[in-house]
């Protein structure tokens, strides 16, 4: 999900305008000529040589965990600047803000050097960026496609759905994947979209998130996944959706004017080493990649999941099952970070089965005050008591305690929100990716994930999650009466015990009270 007010609430408020706005609109135009293309796998580029020099075995996969937002943004821009053959880029959201414009400039600059750029963006949050995407496509070596696009009503998210109301069931399915592949040999994947709040650059609220850079054995599968989405019938050339009014030279000038705001990557305070001791990627590439090695499998929903007409059909191809199957097979411990955590009855039963086998289960999710989509919290809260009675340890992130934890680098006085999607199973198997443990990831959106077997990577992920649990979260537990809940945390002045949802405003409570019971879990 993106950082935004709730889509469904906005749509509901605007529902009365539907009749006025729908007429004459409904379906995306058919694109008869949609050329297919495949990933380019470089063996002689500088990036390829750096990977080859660091790899102990070409069948193994190397990992560089990136919990720091500044470092993660730097890695993307660094890869774009060093690519010589290809950049394959797939995101749910690229915002038209400082970070989005910096990222888009890096793609343009690569194309000007002769790098083939394929950019695939979901069409839900392209509001304010239509021209930017269309104009980038006017450059040589660049193709831009929109996934599952809306035909019209492009002024806002609400008007997109209203203007396409007859196709709501289809358009409600979104591409939530996040992936960047450079020269076919290095990839960055994980939870981050491209916007200020994902890289600790927003003055108001920022996400605690996690990405991973990967090389080696898993790359062939990642290339195949990208190609499957790029060549799917749901990926439409941007110029077929956002109609241009000028020639290619005009569009290029407009793009340059829109994105060249003077900010350079060097102005971003990338730490000399992050909380895990990792150097900026440029130094890693120049001085030798210091990676954790193991085995890995990448997985994704098939693009046609968005065409599923029933929940059962969508679940039959759900990438989420790759995670839950491994979680359910755990023998000792499961540690989960899921910002949007709506387990449903089957998920609760799966966790109950685990704790019944003496498997220790701990889940970190957002508190009501921390979540960017308060209605999702109702889907979690309705299962909270059952989970606690089953023996699951629950931790809820505080939005205001985050800036006290220097290692997580949430800027002082901004709100902290959890966005990392990760799990560690038996201290050796790691999941990282875009998949939330909620109903939308299960049966609505397409997702991308990675399952890695590496005790060292597992230790790093556990350490990062523990930082948030220890200094920035409330532990949810039963009060002395064994029925009501309380939220426990430690502070500089002693223990804190609260008996109501911590830091939540009356408006949050009212919104959930009024709308929560009526929103189907498939929409959360």
Sequence positions of predicted segments:
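Bacterial N-terminal signal peptides that target proteins for export
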Residues: 2-13
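Bacterial N-terminal signal peptides
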Residues: 12-23
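Charged, low-complexity intrinsically disordered terminal segments
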Residues: 25-178, 182-524
């Amino acid at each position: 999900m993106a950082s935004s007010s709730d889509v469904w609430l906005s749509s509901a408020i605007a529902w009365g305008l539907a009749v006025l706005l729908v007429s004459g609109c409904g379906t995306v135009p058919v694109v008869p000529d949609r050329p297919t293309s495949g990933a380019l796998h470089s063996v002689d580029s500088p990036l390829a040589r750096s990977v080859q020099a660091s790899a102990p075995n070409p069948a193994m996969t190397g990992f560089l965990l990136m919990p720091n937002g500044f470092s993660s943004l730097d890695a993307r821009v660094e890869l774009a600047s060093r690519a010589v053959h290809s950049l394959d880029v797939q995101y749910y959201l690229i915002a038209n803000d400082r970070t989005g414009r910096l990222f888009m400039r890096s793609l343009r600059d690569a194309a000007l050097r002769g790098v083939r750029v394929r950019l695939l963006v979901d069409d839900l949050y392209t509001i304010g960026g239509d021209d930017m995407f269309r104009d980038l496509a006017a450059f040589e070596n660049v193709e831009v496609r929109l996934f599952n696009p809306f035909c019209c009503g492009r002024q806002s998210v609400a008007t997109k759905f209203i203007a396409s109301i007859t196709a709501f069931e289809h358009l409600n399915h979104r591409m939530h994947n996040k992936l960047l592949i450079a020269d076919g040999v290095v990839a960055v994947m994980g939870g981050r979209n491209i916007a200020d709040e994902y890289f600790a650059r927003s003055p108001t609220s920022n996400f605690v998130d996690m990405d991973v850079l990967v090389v080696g054995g898993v790359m062939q599968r990642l290339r195949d996944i990208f190609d499957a989405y790029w060549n799917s019938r749901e990926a439409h050339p941007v110029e077929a959706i956002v109609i241009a009014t000028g020639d290619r030279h005009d569009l290029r000038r407009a793009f340059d004017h829109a994105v060249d705001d003077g900010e350079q990557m060097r102005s971003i305070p990338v730490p000399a080493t992050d909380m895990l001791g990792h150097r900026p990627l440029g130094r890693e590439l120049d001085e030798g990649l210091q990676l954790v090695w193991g085995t890995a499998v990448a997985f994704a929903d098939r693009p046609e999941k968005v065409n599923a007409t029933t929940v059962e059909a969508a679940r039959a191809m759900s990438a989420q099952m790759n995670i839950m199957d491994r979680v359910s097979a755990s023998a000792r411990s499961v540690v989960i970070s899921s910002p949007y955590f709506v387990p449903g009855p089957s998920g609760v039963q799966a966790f109950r089965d685990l704790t019944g086998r003496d498997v220790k289960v701990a889940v970190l999710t957002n508190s009501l005050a921390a979540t960017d989509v308060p209605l999702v919290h109702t889907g979690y809260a309705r299962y909270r008591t059952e989970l606690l009675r089953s023996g699951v340890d629950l931790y809820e992130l505080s939005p205001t305690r985050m800036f006290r934890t220097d290692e997580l680098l949430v800027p002082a006085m901004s709100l902290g929100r959890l966005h990392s999607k990760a799990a560690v199973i038996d201290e050796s198997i790691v999941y990282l990716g875009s998949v939330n443990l909620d109903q939308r990831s299960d049966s609505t959106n397409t997702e991308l994930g990675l399952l890695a077997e590496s005790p060292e990577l597992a230790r790093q992920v556990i350490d990062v999650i523990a930082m948030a649990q220890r200094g920035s979260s409330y532990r949810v537990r039963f009060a002395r009466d064994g029925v009501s809940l309380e939220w426990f945390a430690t502070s500089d002045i002693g223990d804190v015990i609260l008996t109501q949802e911590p830091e939540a405003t009356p408006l949050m409570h009212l919104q959930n009270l009024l709308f929560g019971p009526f929103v189907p879990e498939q929409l959360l």
